[in-house]
Amino acid sequence: MADPKSAEDYYFAGIDFFGDGKLDEAIAEYNRALELDPKFADALHGLAQAYYARQDFDRVIEAAQRILALDPEDILAWTSISRAYQRKGMVPEAEEAGNKARILGWKQQLREQKSKGEGNS
């Protein structure tokens, strides 16, 4: 890949490294993307997944909390937190985060069903 210039370039490089199992390189690329765009949620998700694969669960939680600061209803961030807490043996916290993800998922389904119903009227 040519010298990446944009946050998206670094993000896609991170995806490539992650796919190749090069977790440290993926993390570095996601962090470069975030230096350029600290609110780049996809890069934060990638970072959380790379940390999860590396079994660095505290950093998974940290990355997911950064996502939630941008979007408190991000289902994947709540799921990432739940999985990390579970792996840390923090069952009540894992259940709480998992429940939050499920409730948000149900709300999303209801909104989608409602919008489909309105479109059929």
Residue ranges and their predicted role:
Residues 32-54:
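Short, charge-rich amphipathic alpha-helical segments embedded
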Residues 3-35:
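Alpha-helical segment of the N-proximal tetratricopeptide repeat
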Residues 20-29, 54-66, 88-100, 105:
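Structural signature of tandem alpha-helical TPR/SEL1-like repeats
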